[in-house]
Amino acid sequence: YQLYAPVFVDATGNGTLGYYAGAEYRKGSEPQSEFGELHAPQQPNNYRMGNSILLKAKDMGHPVKFTPPSFAKKLTEEQLAKRIHCVQMRDTINCDDSPNPEEYKRTSMTSSACVDYGYWWLELCGDGEDIITEYEAIRDDLIAYAYGIWDHIKNNKEGIHEHHAENYALEWVGALPGVRESRRLVGDYLLSETDILEHKIFEDAVCYGGWCVDLHAPHGLLDFNLLPSDCNFYDGVYTIPYRSYYSKNIKNLYMAGRDISTTRLGLASTRIIGCCAIGGEAVGIAAALCNKYACDPRELAPHVKELQQLILKEDGFLPGFKNEDEKDLALKAKITASSWEQGGEPEKVANGISRKLGEEQNGWVTKPGECLIMKWDETKEIREIRLTFESNFAYPIRVTMAPLRQAQQRNGVPEELVKDVKIELYREGKKTGEAFVKDNYQRLCSVGIGDVPADEIRVIPESTNGAEQAVLRALRVYAK
């Protein structure tokens, strides 16, 4: 097949599209001399983080025997001494070779200290030069080690740890390994570890990240004497520039996901799925703008502020940036309310920041049934009102199949979300229209008004999904 398009996006992970198109790419580690990265090696290498599969077990309520298949790889307690795989290892594992032993132990325990689901450290990197072509061979070895690990957990009686897995039956073993690292396509800028540790705010920022600089052992599980991950933690977040999302030498190629333009240490943070997701959203918006202006990705640079404002409009977040949309009438309105809590004054719905940051509310905090009033000196034909509600970004949501972790998650709609909203429009004191939002389950809610003339709107959050406070983080208003 031959596909023709003005712009392509390589979101393959392996940089497959870019590779076949002749895009410049990198693999392995850059030397410290190239970017001055704190944790870079003195010499370049072809190390890569490995592929992983997971396994899942179920408590049957009675003892269950396990006989390993013939291909299972035998593992000893000594070999797994650096791999947390049961609660008892909380007190015995030696993390002294971690840059931050206590933080490492805490974060590792979150996902590994159970026998019913794991393990992120079940990781292999292959034997050759190209982890991509070795994918199936690595998969076969991973499956063999997965059964070997389960055999160890079920049947090993020689170690110092009691695994307490007598009643557990192996329920599922993954068949498609997750990939952490392969090719990185080169753009006009390579994000480095230095940028991350310095929390750099780029003028052309279109995405942000906050995961630690998380490099795994060079040979994965087979580095038995090493901790599986070398996590370098830091406070705060960093931004990723637009220049890291398009190819340096293929003029109509974007990248999104883990194949964006970074050093290997940059990838150690940006590869996390949440960062990949919001970077993909930014690239999608950028591609639409390329269509609007009939230009290539690099040629879109003069319009990067428009791109940033569109990201914010869609409830994206860019540290160091705020809503400056000239079409947003809320930025020019007089705003008050029937009541509010200290720190959650009504005018903050138009301060340009749509989420709580530290102790700063950045929004109107009140009780259900109260009214926010927005006025203008002249009549507007209101077409759309965009409401951004509190959804509790501070609540940890873990994407996992672990029964223990799933039991800790709240089900359903966040209780903090406003559920029912009434919107009233007035012109010279007379009502000209109204709109309702019922059973809302979204953080960003767009309400089409239909070009109603008004010089005043009133927003009444009538109920929430359970919380006592009703919180409106942002309110945007657009006219005909």
Residue ranges and their predicted role:
Residues A57-M60, R473-K480:
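Short beta-strand-to-coil "C-cap" segments at the C-terminal boundary of structured domains/repeats
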Residues Y1-K327:
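Flavin (FAD/FMN)-binding glycine-rich loop and adjacent Rossmann-like elements that form
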Residues V421-I423:
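Short beta-strand elements bearing conserved aromatic residues within extracellular beta-rich modules
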Residues G369, D377-R386, P453-E456:
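Extended extracellular/luminal ectodomain segments enriched in beta-structured repeat modules
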Residues K313, F317-T379, E390-L417, D439-Y441, ...:
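Disordered, acidic Ser/Thr/Pro-rich linker "stalks" and the adjacent N-terminal cap
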Residues I460-A467:
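Short beta-strand-plus-loop segments that form exposed binding edges in beta-rich domains
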Residues K431-G450:
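Extracellular carbohydrate recognition and processing domains
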